Regions:
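Surface-exposed, low-hydrophobicity interaction/linker segments
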Residues: 61-127
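Short, surface-exposed, charged/polar-biased interaction segments
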Residues: 22, 30-34, 43, 110, ...
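General N-terminal targeting signals
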Residues: 39, 44, 49-52, 104-110, ...
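Charge-rich, low-complexity N-terminal segments
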Residues: 1-67
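A generic structural micro-environment signature
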Residues: 7, 28, 33, 46, ...
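Context-gated lysine
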Residues: 10, 14-15, 68, 79-81, ...
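Mixed-charge, glycine-accented linear interaction segment located at domain edges/termini
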Residues: 128-167
Length: 167
């Protein structure tokens, strides 16, 4: 687990809400406090969609919606002349990307033993922190998956020109 302090909150928010920077992440949950508190559960309810629409939900069939699907809703909740009092977003890496990370990093973990790789975003009204996390279905003292996930996130931040400092 690694904590990253975002150096340019305004630029980060633009990338989060107005671009596709985070669109491939799955949304586990999100909450924002503005004039009221709003909570979004990222659980996918595929029975809501017609059979034709459901066929196009391949990535989301793992049970969570893609950020790109709820980003406009989250933007609507946050836009206005006042900054949100706070927000928290919990992203999770899509299962096919978890498998790619394992393969590319040469790890011995089995994908079915990994419940999720997470990126938690926390804004407190002035500071924005990103915290990596993992959840395994098995006990292990091996932290190689955490290190690989942190390395992947650091490369992601660099590629997307998101300036962070580590704690």
């Amino acid at each position: 687990m690694q904590s990253y302090q975002v150096q340019d909150v305004k630029d980060f928010m633009k990338k989060l809400l107005l671009t596709d920077t985070f669109d491939t992440f799955l949304l586990s949950e999100a909450s924002v406090t503005t004039y009221a508190a709003f909570h979004l559960d990222g659980s996918m309810h595929s029975d809501y969609f017609s059979s034709d629409e459901a066929e196009s939900l391949t990535v989301e069939q793992c049970g969570y919606v893609l950020w790109k699907r709820v980003r406009p809703i989250f933007f609507e909740l946050m836009k206005g002349k006042n900054t949100p009092l706070s927000f928290q977003i919990v992203f999770r890496l899509a299962p096919h990307n978890v498998e790619s990370l394992i393969r590319q990093s040469g790890l011995s973990h089995r994908p079915e033993d990994i419940d999720g790789l997470f990126l938690n975003l926390r804004y407190d009204g002035s500071n924005l922190t990103c915290i990596s996390g993992s959840s395994l279905r098995v006990f292990t003292m091996d932290r190689s998956l955490d290190h690989a996930w942190d390395t992947m996130l650091e490369k992601f931040f660099h590629k997307k020109e998101i300036i962070v400092s580590t704690h």
